[in-house]
Amino acid sequence: MKIAVAGSGYVGLSLGVLLSLQNEVTIVDILPSKVDKINNGLSPIQDEYIEYYLKSKQLSIKATLDSKAAYKEAELVIIATPTNYNSRINYFDTQHVETVIKEVLSVNSHATLIIKSTIPIGFITEMRQKFQTDRIIFSPEFLRESKALYDNLYPSRIIVSCEENDSPKVKADAEKFALLLKSAAKKNNVPVLIMGASEAEAVKLFANTYLALRVAYFNELDTYAESRKLNSHMIIQGISYDDRIGMHYNNPSFGYGGYCLPKDTKQLLANYNNIPQTLIEAIVSSNNVRKSYIAKQIINVLKEQESPVKVVGVYRLIMKSNSDNFRESAIKDVIDILKSKDIKIIIYEPMLNKLESEDQSVLVNDLENFKKQANIIVTNRYDNELQDVKNKVYSRDIFGRD
């Protein structure tokens, strides 16, 4: 089967690699550098499994800048373009998705379009009405950055949307796509759910909001424990051994961040509109309170320093260990709060060559020099290369994992 994938981020590329084991896949992107890397067997993103599969597996995959040619020949078109949250309108920016839909429909009269981008509840219905076609369906992704292909190989569940009154072809394509994902997976007995588009859209947003809820819950627990000088580690262990709660997703942090949780929680809150709720709004608020609290704690530690020059060293901007993503990283908001107090910031981030021009922080990518300059080293996730300056480190990373 010929499949086109719009977007070579961690969602699009992981799906492209997965499906190219048994199908002919063309990845479409607007960046020549990404296209060149993929065509040379290199991954443009950090993902151990994607890197290995591109290098070592027999894949039928290519990348192109020629979107129309790719879409024209495809039987299925997977759309995995960004949908960033627009704080001005309090809604996802879906213009890239809509642009691809319009382009595909203009050159291809038979392909079914499968949206993998995270979208607002009701978006598929809106697009079907706008473009007067039922050939647009949704399949939510449940992937972790840097582990996207692994999560496609070992999925927790597969969800594809389909409506009762859809044409036989669209129904067949929805089932076919679910089967493609299931047959490519290494995990046995993966649950497959076919449901309405709005229900599938809701699953994605509510699932991520629940994960944000867990992060916020354990962060508030940690705030209480630190404020009362209690052992946060022991409290969390004591709670988490309850099977109903579980010893997972319970490690305190500076706040949830990354590409998905911040925008998905805000979008779900926007979708509620006039529907009664308090919890969803509280999750978003809790995350902001946590970041403010962390900044305050750092300032308090600085005040105890005898040095006349106060320098905060930020160790890594990445949100998670082994990630290459800084988007919506909680530490960036903490930095902004500290800078508003005229505190000098130096940053160690080896994945950056320079900071944005308006950033008043200083990039120090010589680790030993960074350690010497900083009065206090702040890190969301602890790394063993800080072991020799452990007495300088402020982190709420209790379990040494994400």
Swiss-Prot record:
<comment type="function">
    <text>Catalyzes the formation of UDP-glucuronic acid which is required for capsular hyaluronic acid synthesis.</text>
</comment>
<comment type="similarity">
    <text>Belongs to the UDP-glucose/GDP-mannose dehydrogenase family.</text>
</comment>
<feature type="binding site">
    <location>
        <position position="257"/>
    </location>
    <ligand>
        <name>substrate</name>
    </ligand>
</feature>
<feature type="binding site">
    <location>
        <position position="320"/>
    </location>
    <ligand>
        <name>substrate</name>
    </ligand>
</feature>
<feature type="binding site">
    <location>
        <begin position="249"/>
        <end position="253"/>
    </location>
    <ligand>
        <name>substrate</name>
    </ligand>
</feature>
<feature type="binding site">
    <location>
        <position position="83"/>
    </location>
    <ligand>
        <name>NAD(+)</name>
    </ligand>
</feature>
<keyword id="KW-0972">Capsule biogenesis/degradation</keyword>
<feature type="active site" description="Nucleophile">
    <location>
        <position position="260"/>
    </location>
</feature>
<keyword id="KW-0520">NAD</keyword>
<feature type="binding site">
    <location>
        <position position="327"/>
    </location>
    <ligand>
        <name>NAD(+)</name>
    </ligand>
</feature>
<feature type="binding site">
    <location>
        <position position="402"/>
    </location>
    <ligand>
        <name>substrate</name>
    </ligand>
</feature>
<feature type="binding site">
    <location>
        <position position="118"/>
    </location>
    <ligand>
        <name>NAD(+)</name>
    </ligand>
</feature>
<dbReference type="InterPro" id="IPR014026">
    <property type="entry name" value="UDP-Glc/GDP-Man_DH_dimer"/>
</dbReference>
<dbReference type="InterPro" id="IPR001732">
    <property type="entry name" value="UDP-Glc/GDP-Man_DH_N"/>
</dbReference>
<dbReference type="GO" id="GO:0003979">
    <property type="term" value="F:UDP-glucose 6-dehydrogenase activity"/>
</dbReference>
<feature type="binding site">
    <location>
        <position position="263"/>
    </location>
    <ligand>
        <name>NAD(+)</name>
    </ligand>
</feature>
<protein>
    <recommendedName>
        <fullName>UDP-glucose 6-dehydrogenase</fullName>
        <ecNumber>1.1.1.22</ecNumber>
    </recommendedName>
</protein>
<dbReference type="InterPro" id="IPR036220">
    <property type="entry name" value="UDP-Glc/GDP-Man_DH_C_sf"/>
</dbReference>
<feature type="binding site">
    <location>
        <position position="319"/>
    </location>
    <ligand>
        <name>substrate</name>
    </ligand>
</feature>
<keyword id="KW-0560">Oxidoreductase</keyword>
<dbReference type="Pfam" id="PF03721">
    <property type="entry name" value="UDPG_MGDP_dh_N"/>
</dbReference>
<dbReference type="InterPro" id="IPR014027">
    <property type="entry name" value="UDP-Glc/GDP-Man_DH_C"/>
</dbReference>
<dbReference type="GO" id="GO:0000271">
    <property type="term" value="P:polysaccharide biosynthetic process"/>
</dbReference>
<dbReference type="Pfam" id="PF03720">
    <property type="entry name" value="UDPG_MGDP_dh_C"/>
</dbReference>
<dbReference type="InterPro" id="IPR013328">
    <property type="entry name" value="6PGD_dom2"/>
</dbReference>
<feature type="binding site">
    <location>
        <begin position="142"/>
        <end position="145"/>
    </location>
    <ligand>
        <name>substrate</name>
    </ligand>
</feature>
<comment type="pathway">
    <text>Nucleotide-sugar biosynthesis; UDP-alpha-D-glucuronate biosynthesis; UDP-alpha-D-glucuronate from UDP-alpha-D-glucose: step 1/1.</text>
</comment>
<dbReference type="GO" id="GO:0051287">
    <property type="term" value="F:NAD binding"/>
</dbReference>
<feature type="binding site">
    <location>
        <position position="145"/>
    </location>
    <ligand>
        <name>NAD(+)</name>
    </ligand>
</feature>
<dbReference type="InterPro" id="IPR017476">
    <property type="entry name" value="UDP-Glc/GDP-Man"/>
</dbReference>
<feature type="binding site">
    <location>
        <position position="34"/>
    </location>
    <ligand>
        <name>NAD(+)</name>
    </ligand>
</feature>
<dbReference type="InterPro" id="IPR008927">
    <property type="entry name" value="6-PGluconate_DH-like_C_sf"/>
</dbReference>
<dbReference type="Pfam" id="PF00984">
    <property type="entry name" value="UDPG_MGDP_dh"/>
</dbReference>
<dbReference type="GO" id="GO:0006065">
    <property type="term" value="P:UDP-glucuronate biosynthetic process"/>
</dbReference>
<feature type="binding site">
    <location>
        <position position="204"/>
    </location>
    <ligand>
        <name>substrate</name>
    </ligand>
</feature>
<dbReference type="InterPro" id="IPR036291">
    <property type="entry name" value="NAD(P)-bd_dom_sf"/>
</dbReference>
<feature type="binding site">
    <location>
        <position position="29"/>
    </location>
    <ligand>
        <name>NAD(+)</name>
    </ligand>
</feature>
<feature type="binding site">
    <location>
        <begin position="2"/>
        <end position="19"/>
    </location>
    <ligand>
        <name>NAD(+)</name>
    </ligand>
</feature>
<dbReference type="InterPro" id="IPR028357">
    <property type="entry name" value="UDPglc_DH_bac"/>
</dbReference>
